[in-house]
Amino acid sequence: PDGHPVPHAQVLRQLLEQAELADEVGLHAFGVGEHHRRDFAVSAPEVFLAAAAARTKKIRLGSAVTVLSSDDPIRVFQRFATVDAISNGRAEVMLGRGSFVESFPLFGLDLADYEVLFEEKLELFDKVRAQKPIKWEGRTRRPINGLSVYPPLEHHLLPAWIGVGGTPESVLRCAEYGYPIIFAIIGGTPGSFAPLAGLYREAMAKYGHPMQQMATHSPGHIAATDEEAREEFFPHWLGQRNQLGAERGPHTVDQRQRCLIGFGQRRQNHFVPTE
C-alpha cells in the first residue's frame, strides 16, 4: 500500500487471514496460484491450503492454478488428496500450463517440451484421479504398470478444473477430458471469450461428455464505490502490466489499452468444430 514490497512471509500470513474472512462471510471458494518469482508469495499452494483448511469450516479450497507441466501428476494428486482429508472434502485443483515459465528452468525442464509435458502429465493425472491401478507410458517419465496411488479420497473423485488462457486448442483439450473449464481473462473484455465458451459447449457434446461448469477469472478490486476502486487499483494494475510487457515484450498498457498477455499455443486435435 505504501509503495514498498511486503515480505513474502507477511503476505502468506495475510492470505490466511483473508481465507478465514472469506469463510466467515460465506464465500463459496478460495483459491491461490502457484508462482516462482519475486512478485508472488505462494510457491506451494497445497501447503497453504492445508493451513487454511485447519482455520476454516465450509469454504472450498483450491489452486488457481497448479502448474502441472513442471510438477509430478502423482504428487499433485497426493498433496490435494491430503488437503481434502484435512478439510473434510473441501479440496479442488485447477490445472494449467501457467503463463509464467520460471518453474521450467527451476525444476530442470526444457521449455522446448512445453506442449508435450502438459499433454502427458494431464493424461497421467486423469488416470491417477480415477483412483484405479495405473498403467501408463509416455516420453517424459518411466512407464507405470499397475501401481496404485495413496491416499485415496474418501467419498468422491477429486474435483479438477482446467485453466485456459484463451486459445481454441486449450479449450478442446479441456473438453476432450470432460473437465470443467475456467477462462483466465487477464486482459481484454469478457465478451471476447464468448466464442470459446461456445466452442467448449460444442466440443463437450462431440466428445460425449455431460456439460460441466464454466467459470471466468479476472483481476479486480473492491472499494466503497466503482470510481474509488478504479482510482486505487489502476496504478498497481498498470505497473504490473508494464512490468510483464517489459519482460515479454513488446506490449505496455495505458488507460486506452487492454492487452492480452499470454503465450501462443498450438495443438493437434482430431476434433473439428462445426462452422
Q: For the regions a protein language model found, what residue spans apply to each?
A:
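Hydrophobic faces of well-ordered beta-strands that scaffold small-molecule active sites
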Residues: 1, 30-32, 61-64, 91-95, ...
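N-terminal beta1-alpha1-beta2 module of alpha/beta enzyme domains
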Residues: 1-61, 156-158
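Active-site mouth loops of central-metabolism enzymes
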Residues: 1-13, 64-74, 154-166, 221-223, ...
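Short, solvent-exposed loop/turn segments at secondary-structure boundaries
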Residues: 6-8, 41-43, 73-74, 106-108, ...
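Acidic-and-aromatic substrate-binding clefts and catalytic sites of carbohydrate-active enzymes
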Residues: 36-44, 68-74, 188-193, 222
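Short catalytic/ligand-binding loop motif for oxyanion handling, primarily in non-cytosolic enzymes
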Residues: 39, 101-103, 170, 223-226
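An alpha-helical appendage that flanks or caps ligand/catalytic pockets
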Residues: 112-149, 190-275
